[in-house]
Amino acid sequence: FNGFFAAGSAASYGPSELLVKDTNIYNESYTWWTDFIFQAMFAATAATIVSGAVAERVKLPAFMIFAVLLVGIAYPWAGSWHWGGGFLAGMGFVDFAGSTVVHAFGGFAALACVIVLGPRAGKYTANGVRPILGHSMPLAAIGVFLLFFGWFGFNGGSVLAAEPHLVS
């Protein structure tokens, strides 16, 4: 959150938003801080897409530094192409709830990392391809349920209001 707060949040919406963003025009209960937390979750989602691709290929401290740079600098820059009135917005680009901005950015960042890092250690041997099995099915199942239930709030927030007729 610190990288996104320090530089990314304002940069995503262009130079007119460097100090305070007026979100009350949409909904009086939707404050700048509410929008900041919501957009920070989008930025974190882009970083988690990369984390899944580089798992077991990088050390945690190196990934944390990378994630701060990704979330604080690269993601807001790419987000400003659409949300900040950038060239994509000028071309009439439609992106409901940031699905393309978040997932395409995360996917391309993950692809770039995988190209640089190469395959996981031990995946390819002289005898051919060695399968690397999952480590913890209970943890994987917990992750699926957390993602499943968390997505309801995430997608509901995408319409900037918690009203049933908007999120259905």
Regions found by a protein language model. Name each.
Residues 1-168:
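Hydrophobic alpha-helical transmembrane bundles of multi-pass membrane proteins
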